[in-house]
Amino acid sequence: MKVSLASTAHYSVEAAESLKDLNPNAADVLITSVITSMVTDIGVVSPTSGALLSYFDGSSSSFHTIDGYFNSPKNFKGNDHEEHRISMTYGGYVETCKGVNTFAIPGIYKVLNTIHDRYGSIPLSKLFEYPIELAKRGFNLPQPSKDYLRHSLEPLFMWHATSKRTLSDVYENLDSGVVVLTKLADTLEHMSLVGMDDFYIGDISKEVLSTIMSEGGHATKNDFKDYNLLEDYNFITKSKDLKLIGNAGPSIGGLMVLKYLDALQTNKSNLKENLINVYKERKAHYEFFGNREQFINNQISKITQSPSTIQVNTSDDSNNHFSITFSSGYGSGVQCKNTGMYLNNSLGEIELNPQGFLGDTKNERLISNMSPMIIETDKGISTIGSPGADRISSA
């Protein structure tokens, strides 16, 4: 079978090539690419990432979406309620919060497990082989991680004892330092044998929760167990000769893409002002908790009538197409010592938590601007995606 891959992470290409003798399909390549990136692209993503997926099913000629983004803990009853805010020169200047109290429950393994169950043709033990081997033997950081860690390594990743040991070599020499993740390799090997749900209800979740509880975080066993995907919360609309399919509310990324496309079709003399106004409108009106799903979908309906992130796209000659965007926020700096997993800081992303640090999120999906999309034209199907946070709205 012929498979195409487009990715912002170069180790994921090597991961795909490692499967070539097994005749992989697009789902297989997607899974091994994503797992590999969560190992290697430290800081940009992590093994506790949230994800949005758009895909086209060739057998039924149907479009679908899966929302596996972060869910807030039901309550904030951990011991640490302090906002550990740091600043860094990344992107000029940015502030974010570190610490395990910024962790929210990610859906990446639910997403990948769903795709593997429906489309996968190769056992997880084979799909995980390359990232496991890479974690065991060690690797140099990919360029996106280097670019980010030049700004974030000291303030965000060297304060935590476990992370400090892991990154000691790259702290000495960012360009040629080697990262070895033996514990993470063991964790992924275990996951490949017992299944990805172990992150939510098995030994892996117990170890992650042990770190969260001992260091003052708020996620609980029930938060992990009760995590659910949101499937087919999507929109389908036309823009000139393009048919666009993406995630609708509660994610706001798809809406923002449509808003910008709408602005680009208005008076060209006021183009810059129009685009700036879209960004301001988002900040003022779309970033809130409550019934965001209905509000965003209503906004999308109006348009169709009148976004630290990795992107992976795969397609195959069975006409299956996948577009996934996944993120770990800026990273909490916390590494779970018994699993080797770095933890996200989704609750600590200041620009995506308008309710304030540990404010009322109503046990909802957190706000995302990520926007993986499927595009259909008379020439066929294409996949596309964008980073999230403020980047999609201010780039």
Feature-to-residue mapping (PLM):
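Noncatalytic scaffold domains of N-terminal-nucleophile
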Residues: 1-194, 199-201, 206-242, 248, ...
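Short, well-ordered beta-strand elements
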Residues: 4-5, 65-66, 242-249, 256-263, ...
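Active-site rim segments in enzyme catalytic domains, especially the processed small/beta chain
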Residues: 39-56, 60-64, 218-220, 320-382, ...
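A short, polar/proline- and glycine-enriched secondary-structure boundary/capping micro-motif
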Residues: 74-80, 255-259, 332-337, 391-395
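Active-site-proximal alpha-helical segments within enzyme catalytic domains
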Residues: 107-115, 179-190, 256-263, 315-324, ...
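Conserved phosphate/anionic-ligand binding catalytic regions in large, soluble enzymes, centered on
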Residues: 199, 203, 251-256, 391
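Short, small/polar residue-rich loop motifs at catalytic or cofactor-binding pockets
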Residues: 231, 306-309, 368-370
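Internal maturation/activation junctions in enzymes
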Residues: 259-327, 336
